[in-house]
C-alpha cells in the first residue's frame, strides 16, 4: 500500500476507525528479558539445575533495571522454567505437567464461557475417561483396585453431604486417572475437572441429593466392571455415568434459567 496514495489514505482511515485508533503496544523491557532468557534456557545454554547469573549480572548484561529482571524471572517461574528461593540465584528447572497444563487454563476458561463450550469439554472428558477405565480393567494392580474401592467407600459415606460428595466424586475419578502412572494424564484430568466444576451452575443442595445417589450407583457399576477385567463393560458403565451427569447438569441449568 502506497502511503501517499489518496485511496490508501481512505483505506487507512477506515482501518483506523474500525480499530478505534488504538496504538500498537510496545513490549516491556521485562518481557524482552524474559523472552531472551527463555530462548537461552531452551537452547540448553543453561542446564537443568544450573543457577542463572545473579540479578546484578543480568541487569548489566541486558542493560535494564532490577525490576525488569525480577519481573522476567517471575514470569519464567510461572512457566516452570526456573525455581526461585529467597536469597539464592534462580535455578533452571524442567516444567512439570501441571505447569504445562496451567498455561492453558485461561484459554480453557474462555472457551467454556462460549455457547457449547461446556458440551465440548464434557465430550473431551468422556473420550479421555473412557480410555482410563478400559486401561484400568486390563492393567490395574490389586493395590490400585484397593485404592479405587476405598475411594468408592468414601463416596458412599458422603452421600448426605453435597460438598463432601463432590470432593469424594472428584477423588474417585482422580484415582482412575492415576492408574496408568502418566503424570500428563493426571495433570490433564485435574485441570479438566477443575474447569468443568467451575463452569457448572450453583444448584440448591436439595436438588442434588438424588443426583448423588445415582452417581454413586454408577460408580459401583464402573468398579464392578474393572474388577471383572471387562474393558467393554467398564467403558459402557463410564459412558452411562458421564452422559447421565451431563444431562443432569443441563437440566438443572435450564431449570435455573427458567426461574429468572
Curated annotation (Swiss-Prot):
UniProt xrefs under InterPro entries: GntR_C, TF_FadR/GntR_C, Tscrpt_reg_HTH_GntR, Tscrpt_reg_NanR, WH-like_DNA-bd_sf, WH_DNA-bd_sf
Any one of the GO BP annotations: negative regulation of DNA-templated transcription
DNA-binding region range list: 55-74
HTH gntR-type domain residues: 27-95
Region (Disordered): 1-20
Keywords from the named record: DNA-binding, Repressor, Transcription, Transcription regulation
GO MF annotations, alphabetized: DNA binding; DNA-binding transcription factor activity
Stated role: Transcriptional repressor that controls expression of the genes required for the catabolism of sialic acids.
Record family assignment: Belongs to the NanR family.
PANTHER family tied to this protein: HTH-TYPE TRANSCRIPTIONAL REPRESSOR NANR (PTHR43537:SF53), TRANSCRIPTIONAL REGULATOR, GNTR FAMILY (PTHR43537)
Protein name listed in UniProt: HTH-type transcriptional repressor NanR
Name of the gene encoding the protein in the UniProt record: nanR
Amino acid at each position: 500500500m502506497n502511503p501517499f496514495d489518496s485511496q490508501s489514505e481512505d483505506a487507512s482511515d477506515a482501518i483506523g476507525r474500525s480499530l478505534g485508533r488504538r496504538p500498537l503496544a510496545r513490549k516491556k523491557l521485562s518481557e524482552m528479558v524474559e523472552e531472551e532468557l527463555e530462548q537461552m534456557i531452551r537452547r540448553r545454554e543453561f542446564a537443568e539445575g544450573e543457577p542463572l547469573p545473579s540479578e546484578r549480572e543480568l541487569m548489566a548484561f541486558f542493560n535494564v533495571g532490577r525490576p525488569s529482571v525480577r519481573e522476567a524471572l517471575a514470569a519464567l517461574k510461572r512457566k516452570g522454567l526456573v525455581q526461585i528461593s529467597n536469597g539464592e540465584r534462580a535455578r533452571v528447572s524442567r516444567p512439570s505437567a501441571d505447569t504445562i497444563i496451567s498455561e492453558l487454563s485461561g484459554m480453557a476458561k474462555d472457551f467454556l464461557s462460549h455457547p457449547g463450550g461446556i458440551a465440548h469439554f464434557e465430550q473431551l472428558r468422556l473420550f479421555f475417561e473412557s480410555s482410563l477405565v478400559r486401561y484400568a480393567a486390563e492393567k490395574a494392580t490389586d493395590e490400585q483396585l484397593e485404592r479405587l474401592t476405598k475411594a468408592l467407600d468414601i463416596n458412599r459415606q458422603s452421600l448426605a453431604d453435597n460438598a463432601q460428595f463432590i470432593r469424594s466424586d472428584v477423588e474417585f475419578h482422580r484415582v482412575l486417572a492415576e492408574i496408568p502412572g502418566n503424570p500428563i494424564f493426571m495433570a490433564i484430568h485435574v485441570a479438566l475437572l477443575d474447569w468443568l466444576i467451575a463452569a457448572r451452575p450453583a444448584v440448591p443442595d436439595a436438588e442434588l441429593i438424588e443426583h448423588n445417589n445415582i452417581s454413586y450407583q454408577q460408580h459401583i457399576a464402573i468398579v464392578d466392571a474393572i474388577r471383572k477385567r471387562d474393558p467393554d463393560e467398564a467403558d459402557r458403565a463410564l459412558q452411562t455415568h458421564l452422559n447421565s451427569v451431563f444431562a443432569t447438569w443441563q437440566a438443572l441449568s435450564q431449570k435455573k434459567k427458567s426461574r429468572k
